[in-house]
């Protein structure tokens, strides 16, 4: 350990110790709301913000993409155009999908491209038709839910008919779901007398980072009580249980970190000189990973300075840079690897603390 580091900084963390975390479920103020308090010496703004971002951006959800909405042309007799119909059904939620296991074994349950988006590819990839076809063949073997919505309606009355979610039939793995009927109807559009519509939509798995139709929650926020105590608040959109969402958000972060650790071990087979500044480019990543890596490196006893940047706002690529003290006892790649191990332990512990309800 560098003496200069210990004498100048009061926020050093021991990356070799067990993370100090407590999780407390608070009383919700609204229906479907989850409020959890995270507290402990290992909790700070970066750790909590990564959870918040993961809740909002990364939890996989089934939704209707317009490419999977099929309108029957000879029964589409109304005043609307196809684009409007696509927009309506893309934003229609799907309720009560028993999708609890997809992160346990991503190789079995997640499409290839989605798995890469979630858990990191870290290197720049080049799209080819061959790779796309290979991914489709692999995806065909995945254990995904088959979710299908149908709507067939002709207004045979003399009055306008408000078409709602109650007029839709949705099936999950061939079984009719009562997710729409047991909730208040969601108004979709109006059919005038003698107008009709017939369509079928198939759901696929996606994440909100790529398309907002796959949001699992309303806007997630965190509130600072003190530097080591925060409250995270969000409301589930009812496809997934509110506790399942939090567990998945933490699981995604630690699995992403595990993949990053594997990538570093493959890429850096030998350590570097402790006096050397290390710059690592990670493609496909954004502020979620960048902030927690920066934070843990800045609080590590061996690191003199550390930071990250996202060079382009519209391109997912981060550059992580750090330098050890010259008298450091271990190499920079080993330090980074140990810091990542600490973060993996932290988020695993956090996931285990989420109630199983």
Curated annotation (Swiss-Prot):
EC number: 2.7.7.6
GO biological process, one term: DNA-templated transcription
Signal peptide boundaries: none
GO molecular function (one): DNA-directed RNA polymerase activity
EC primary class: transferase
Top-level taxon of origin: Viruses
Record-level GO cellular component terms: DNA-directed RNA polymerase complex; virion component
Keyword flag Transferase: yes
Subcellular location: Virion
Keyword annotations of the record: DNA-directed RNA polymerase, Nucleotidyltransferase, Transcription, Transferase, Virion
SUPFAM superfamilies hit by this protein: Insert subdomain of RNA polymerase alpha subunit, RBP11-like subunits of RNA polymerase
InterPro entries: RBP11-like, RBP11-like_dimer, RNApol_insert_sf
Catalytic reaction list: RNA(n) + a ribonucleoside 5'-triphosphate = RNA(n+1) + diphosphate
A Pfam family this chain is assigned to: RNA_pol_L_2
The UniProt record lists the keyword Nucleotidyltransferase: yes
Family: Belongs to the archaeal Rpo11/eukaryotic RPB11/RPC19 RNA polymerase subunit family.
Protein name: Putative DNA directed RNA polymerase subunit R470
